[in-house]
Regions:
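A short beta-strand-to-loop transition that corresponds to the Sensor-1 phosphate-sensing loop
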Residues: 104-108, 114, 129-131, 387-390
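Residue-level preference for the first positions of well-ordered beta-strands
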Residues: 21-23, 71-74, 100
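Conserved P-loop NTPase "ATPase switch" module shared by AAA+ and STAND
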Residues: 68-84
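Short glycine-rich substrate-engagement loop in P-loop NTPases that contacts/grips substrate
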Residues: 44-72
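Short regulatory helix/loop adjacent to the ATP-binding pocket of P-loop NTPases
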Residues: 109-125, 137-142
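A cross-kingdom feature that marks ATP-driven nucleic-acid transaction machinery
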Residues: 1-29, 33-49, 251-252, 257-259, ...
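Conserved catalytic/switch belt of AAA+ P-loop NTPases
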Residues: 85-109, 116-117
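Interdomain hinge/linker elements that couple catalytic modules in large macromolecular machines
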Residues: 138-316, 328-331
């Protein structure tokens, strides 16, 4: 399979010139190792902690491990050998070389606290997701997303027109590199193997889940609630477990980068706001497989198509900003009257409000609810309605209809 350029490469290389250690996190099979091997020169050692002998050496004698596998080094699945972190700290303190140690990890819940305690100030941490629609199309931008009409029009000129069939093919197929272009039979076998071989094994290693049958039911239950507010009672009922257990299990899925929780927006000046996050799958292909959508067309024409489209757009935004130069905060707005705005992009104390609609011609009156931002001392920037229109179209001076392929 031909290598697909990843948007994270630019940011990784920049941090590599600044930090001595770089950690790339993300779900299993999203391409972390492939990207780093592509970027590495021939002198960088590679070792994976999936190798039992290498892992045993790392656990029993970290000093000897680094004598055997000398830096510069790429260590895969480092969360399996947390004993290495103290020795990595020693190596960093004894060397001035940048980019000396590259790490990958796929279990955030088990690893990040140890990393931050041991390697504070020495490590840069990045997250890689499954392939975005832009990456699959070979369109990697070097400028951050800008919601002004002029910037959107400039981006539009570099891209083909928005196409609902292509969008839902991407949603159904997902972004796992190994399923790109394969037939339906192989796709189903891949996701079945992914759950059995990787996900269930990682869940078992988490130590808090022993009933894998119920956990599979819980996973399917999560897929049925995609793009909705988290409801622990409903999730618990889907697997025959207690709501408190459902809450713990959802934390595991977040830690494994399977599920993404979009936090609710909070501001002291705006009263009675929701405190419940919304649930999205990091990879829509896995979600579609769990819900047994057998073709892109049945998904596109099904009752859940709007929810999947929202999941797709939200995760494209998440990926875009995870790889961007600037730091933003993504939330959603919902008050006690069920007034909801799908996404707030908060950047430099400016809020860009966004609605998500599968329609090619949504109601422009949707943007009127953005005035809720003006009720507080908040700065409102350009926003709009992300939809299936073919080109950016102004709604008013601040908002546009935004083709989803521009995100």
């Amino acid at each position: 399979m031909e290598y697909i350029t990843r948007e994270l490469e630019r940011k990784f290389l920049k941090l590599n010139d600044f930090f001595k250690v770089i950690l790339v996190t993300g779900a299993r099979q999203v391409g972390k190792t492939t990207m780093l091997k592509h970027l590495a020169d021939s002198g960088r050692t590679y070792v994976t902690m999936d190798n039992a002998m290498a892992r045993e050496l790392a656990e029993s004698d970290p000093v000897l491990f680094f004598q055997t596998y000398k830096p510069p080094i790429l260590i895969d699945e480092v969360q399996k050998a947390p004993e290495l972190f103290e020795q990595i700290k020693v190596i960093c303190d004894e060397s001035d070389e940048k980019g000396l140690i590259w790490l990958t990890g796929s279990q955030q819940y088990k690893m990040m606290e140890r990393v931050r305690e041991t390697l504070a100030g020495r490590i840069g941490i990045l997250e890689l997701y499954s392939l975005s629609a832009r990456e699959k199309a070979g369109m990697v931008f070097d400028t951050d997303l800008d919601f002004s009409l002029a910037a959107l029009q400039a981006r539009q000129r570099k891209l083909p027109k928005n196409d609902v069939l292509q969008v839902f093919n991407h949603i159904w197929e997902g972004g796992m590199p190994q399923v790109q272009g394969v037939d339906n039979e192989l796709r189903q076998e891949y996701f079945n193997s992914y759950i059995d071989t990787y996900l269930m094994r990682d869940v078992a290693e988490a130590g808090c889940i022993t009933d894998t049958v119920r956990f599979c039911k819980f996973l399917v239950g999560c897929a049925s609630l995609v793009s909705e507010q988290v409801n622990y009672a409903t999730l618990a009922e889907s697997a025959g477990i207690a709501p408190s257990t459902a809450k713990e299990w959802l934390k595991v899925l977040v830690g494994l980068h399977i599920v993404y929780l979009l936090a609710p927006y909070f501001n002291n000046e705006l009263k009675r706001l929701s405190k419940t996050p919304k649930l999205y799958f990091c990879d829509t292909g896995l979600c579609a497989y769990l819900s047994m959508w057998l073709t892109p067309d049945t998904l596109r024409n099904g009752a859940a198509s709007g929810h999947y489209y929202e999941n797709y757009v939200v995760m494209e935004l998440v990926k875009n900003y995870a790889y961007a130069k600037s730091k933003v905060n993504l939330t959603y707005f919902r008050d006690s009257n069920a007034k909801e705005i799908d996404v707030f992009v908060e950047e430099n104390n400016v809020i860009h409000p966004l609605e998500i609609k599968k329609s090619a011609s949504p109601d422009r009156r949707e943007v009127k609810k953005y005035s809720v931002i003006d009720k507080a001392s908040l700065n409102r920037g350009n926003g709009g309605i992300i939809c299936m229109c073919e080109e950016p179209i102004p709604i008013d001076t601040d908002n546009c209809f935004i083709p989803s392929n521009l995100i």
